[in-house]
Amino acid sequence: MVQSPPPPAPPDSSVVKVSPTTAQTSGDRARFAVHMTLQHKGGVTKSFCANCLAQYYQATGRVASVLDADPTNKTLAAYKALNVRSVDIMKDDNNIDTRKFDDLIEAFVTEDNDFIVDNGATNFLPFISYLVANSAASILADNGRRLVLHIPLVGGEALNETMVGFDDIAKAFATDVQIVVWLNEAAKGVISLNGKNFEESRSYERNKGKILGLIRVPYHTSELFGQDMETILSKKLTFAQAIESPDTRLMSKQRLKQMQREIFEQISAVI
């Protein structure tokens, strides 16, 4: 069984404070949630999405078990400040270890807290197949848990592949899921589909009933924003750690606070 991590330390003054919205404290959103990052292509910021979610939970004093289920690249687990637990649900033949996955689902429905689960590209197909074949989303819903799938889209050459991934995931889950689309323009450029934004696409129109919300990671014209973000990602630092560090220059701290605020405010509005 997966055990809950210890409650996070009280947030420090460097962290942007976000108050819960009305939507977060009423109706469906009051139930425990299982957040999973999914995308069939590697290197498209899945771990970044999980990382930001975990930081948001920590900053707002909400409790979540943060799990890294990527069998090959334990990116999220490298963030020591986030109390990430590495879980191994794959066998040597790259198939799901059903017993371990059963235990994971059991933890989702018995532990009284949210979960954040980061998945990799290599376990994408077996992971999806298990969830669908075992009606995992319905099981979670029947036990008062929401399954929230976080799907990143990035610009540039990877846009079409990530759009295909989004369509495949949305199609695989007919009911009992909510989808959060991360439009990460900071990673590989502006997300534009034949001159149209994502909200004007056929993919969005087909699946908007399942979409809980969009989180846009904006592209900043000043390359210094990108450099500051790359620094904390390469050093596996949270926003709070970097902002509090005496090694971080004053204007870098200001840019990091701005990026943190942009992301956290959108997470607050969505989840």
Which sequence ranges carry the predicted segments?
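Extreme N-terminal, non-catalytic leader segments
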Residues: M1-M36, D103
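NTP-binding/hydrolysis catalytic cores, primarily Walker-type P-loop NTPases
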Residues: Q227-I271
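Conserved catalytic-core segment of NTP-binding enzymes
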Residues: N123-Q227
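Short amphipathic alpha-helical segment that frequently serves as the phosphate-/nucleotide-binding helix
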Residues: S47-C52, M163-D167
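Amphipathic coiled-coil/heptad-repeat helices and related helical stalk/stem segments
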Residues: A50, D97-F101, T162
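Glycine-rich phosphate-binding P-loop
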Residues: M36-N51
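Nucleotide-state-sensitive switch-loop elements of NTP-binding domains
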Residues: S26-M36, A59, V63-F124
